[in-house]
């Protein structure tokens, strides 16, 4: 018998989340949960995969999956084409939300805050450790723009390969990093009967406060 959408559900029983387990600020807890995800989740799940939501000038939301590439006490860093749709949206409205979901651990983290560009030096440092194909792709692909077909894209790649045949590609000005500076971070731990644990951290006057939310 084929399972219907209404019947698709899973009871979460792996773990709980209490205030006693949680530090006063959220970064230590995120580091701990992220380490758990790296050590537990198996392919095809990528522990650093996240959904990034942005808003355009008309107030319409857009979301897509990206990879987290930096984390420190300032915030969460990702890289992209500044001329892409998300880049234009962030230029117009520099706020975003991220969601991480780790199904094996039955955990989710939601992060919201202001977004700013990282320095050109930081962007170049990450660009230079990317695989060569990815570095060339940053030059070749007019991200988010309409192209005729796959052949056009592959032609742009060939032109870029020829351009940099005898020289190491440098980071293009239209490509680089953003850092989300969190103002809110919610940790969600799945629990039985949908009575999930939700601990919410909010940054108020440069200090983090923690509160429990009803599931």
Swiss-Prot record:
UniProt catalytic activity: pyridoxamine 5'-phosphate + O2 + H2O = pyridoxal 5'-phosphate + H2O2 + NH4(+); pyridoxine 5'-phosphate + O2 = pyridoxal 5'-phosphate + H2O2
Matching SUPFAM superfamilies: FMN-binding split barrel
Keyword list, A-Z: Flavoprotein, FMN, Oxidoreductase, Pyridoxine biosynthesis
Gene Ontology annotations of biological process type: pyridoxine biosynthetic process
Keyword flag Chloroplast: no
Cofactor: FMN
Domain of life the protein comes from: Bacteria
Disulfide bonds: none
EC number of the protein: 1.4.3.5
Pfam families on file: PNP_phzG_C, PNPOx_N
Pathway listed: Cofactor metabolism; pyridoxal 5'-phosphate salvage; pyridoxal 5'-phosphate from pyridoxamine 5'-phosphate: step 1/1; Cofactor metabolism; pyridoxal 5'-phosphate salvage; pyridoxal 5'-phosphate from pyridoxine 5'-phosphate: step 1/1
Residue positions binding substrate: 9-12, 69, 126, 130, 134, 194-196
UniProt GO MF annotations: FMN binding; pyridoxamine phosphate oxidase activity
Family affiliation: Belongs to the pyridoxamine 5'-phosphate oxidase family.
Subunit: Homodimer.
Protein name per the record: Pyridoxine/pyridoxamine 5'-phosphate oxidase
Species, as recorded: Pseudomonas syringae pv. syringae (strain B728a)
Taxonomic classification: Bacteria, Pseudomonadati, Pseudomonadota, Gammaproteobacteria, Pseudomonadales
């Amino acid at each position: 018998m084929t399972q219907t959408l209404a019947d698709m559900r899973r009871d979460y029983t792996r773990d709980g989340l209490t205030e006693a387990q949680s530090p006063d600020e959220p970064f230590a807890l995120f580091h701990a949960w992220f380490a758990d995800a790296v050590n537990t989740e198996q392919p095809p799940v990528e522990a650093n995969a996240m959904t990034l939501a942005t808003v355009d000038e008309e107030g319409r939301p857009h979301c897509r999956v990206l990879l987290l590439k930096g984390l420190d006490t300032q915030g969460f860093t990702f890289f992209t084409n500044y001329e892409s749709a998300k880049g234009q949206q962030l230029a117009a409205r520099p706020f975003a939300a991220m969601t991480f979901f780790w199904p094996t651990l039955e955990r989710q983290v939601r992060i919201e805050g202001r977004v700013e560009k990282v320095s050109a030096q930081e962007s170049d440092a990450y660009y230079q450790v990317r695989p060569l194909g990815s570095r060339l792709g940053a030059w070749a692909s007019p991200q988010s723009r309409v192209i005729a077909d796959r052949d056009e894209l592959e032609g742009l790649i060939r032109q870029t390969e020829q351009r940099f045949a005898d020289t190491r590609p440098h980071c293009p000005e239209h490509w680089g990093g953003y850092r989300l500076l969190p103002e809110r971070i919610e940790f969600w731990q799945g629990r039985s009967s949908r009575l999930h644990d939700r601990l919410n951290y909010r940054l108020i006057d440069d200090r983090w406060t923690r509160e429990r939310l009803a599931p």
